[in-house]
Amino acid sequence: DVERSRGLGDVYKRQNIYLSIDSERRRYLLYSSVLSGVLYGLKAEIVRVEVDVGNGIPSFEMSGFLSNEVKEARERVRVAIRNSGYELPPQRIVVNISPADIRKCGTGFDLPIALAILSANGYIDEVNVDNMIILGELSLDGSINGVSGVLPCVCEAKKSGISKALIPVSNYNEGRIVEKVNIIPTNSLKMAVQYINNGIIENQRQDNPEQCRTTDKQEINYADICGQEAAKRATMIAVAGMHNIMYIGPPGSGKTMMAKRIPSIMPDMTFDEKLAVTNIYSVAGQLGEYGGLVEDRPFRAPYHNVTKSSFFGGGMFPRPGEITLAGKGVLFLDEMTEFKPEILEGLRQPLEDKDITIVRMGRTYTYPADFMLVGAMNPCKCGYYPDRSRCNCSEQDIKRYIGKISMPLWDRFDMCIKTDEIGYEQIRCSSDNGNVPDSESMKQAVMRARFAQLKRFNGMNIKYNSQMSTGDMKRFCRLGEEEEKLIKRIFAKKRLTARGYSKILKTARTIADIDGNVNITTANISEAFYYRGIPEVTIH
């Protein structure tokens, strides 16, 4: 009560100062504006929050092409201002967020609206909020909650020449990634006003940089998997060239374990990749408790009943979906035949274009979809084919089951590998002699192949063998006479599509890099073709 009385005393003092100002100055004070940001896809645009306080029937009106959650700020802002110790005169308040042709959504406009109202009423000097972007959601008690999309907003502020950003404390680690912008964290409306008036902020958050990592590295290793040496080599090749791969095998053969360990052999992300991934997760509101720069490559494994908008992105106010959240990492579809046909067929275009375009309310949103697709499935409905002692599925049943994945989608997998059931002797042999490929040795082989690709594609806009165009293949996948005869014979015998032919050559190029070969050999082509046995690998 004492604290509230002091606050009200300050209010009355401010009111008296306000009333003593000449009428011309008072008219100026009744209008104020501050800067904020709105998300548009993965980017942000700077917007201006304008407030006019005038005579008339007391009301609070808002305009500027606003979503429902922005309109709901009326009551949040009014109550938060009162509970922070500030009193507003019973006048007509009009809020406009411009430009009006951009849809405004999210709760990050609460704080800028409140500060603009306080500025218009003389509680703060508008000059002090010049060159500052303001973001934050208000609670009824005046505290400030975190919001999504702070990173792209601060990045856009930097591009626009804005030097300061007033953001929630919980978004501090995220905001400070951007250099040359003074990040001001605040946890209450009162603290924000204190900073604007006095340039002082209390309890500025200074987290340990190690806490900024938003994903927890699990101690998983390919050494945990006994046997499956062929599948491990195929996985290593797939990661080296960012090739899409499918695991087919009975339940318990290690398909899921194999896939979940892929991040352990992927090279660490560059800073630019980390920034791109962090930007995506910021927009999606999935940066976690500490926020900050995402250090680990994404591994997304959506359940098979995922909705179309959650998978591809979209909704009334578009947000990134699973295929975008998996960017620079792995999208793992376990039990792939259980996914809805519209999900599987919808993958075809993003796999080719590496992005997805969504149209909502007359605007076009383009999200990246630069991921490595990893699938896992059983060879038949019961899962035990070709073990006829346990499998009673007919060949027609098997074909029908495999047919849940269309041939155009099959064609987009560079590699397919069987994971056979592991017997007791294999488990004991592997555990006794310790001669099991582990993640560290596999990662070193991947790094050597990646280095070869880095030199090969230096100065080009591609990084991996899987990204080569037809022209790039003619340049980097030249074949000798024997190799040409072999690929020609395979093409004719198996009636390959043009895409299938290019997939074999790209995979062969990666195998050559893994083995340290300058040129593609017949052995490389034969191995690449072995991985393209789709779907014959399951029924022969």
Feature map (PLM): residue ranges:
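Walker B catalytic acidic pair
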Residues: K328, D334-E335
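The Walker A (P-loop) glycine that initiates the GxxxxGKT/S ATP-binding motif of P-loop NTPases
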Residues: G249, G313, E335
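Walker A/P-loop
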Residues: Y247-Q286
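Peripheral, non-AAA+ core regions of ATP-driven protein-machinery
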Residues: N16-M246, S253-T256, G500-Y501, V518-H540
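Short glycine-rich substrate-engagement loop in P-loop NTPases that contacts/grips substrate
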Residues: P302-I323
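Single conserved hydrophobic/aromatic residue that forms the stacking wall/gate
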Residues: D1-Q15, E137
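Basic, amphipathic alpha-helical bundle interface domains used for macromolecular binding and assembly
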Residues: L66-R74, P89, N96-G106, P318, ...
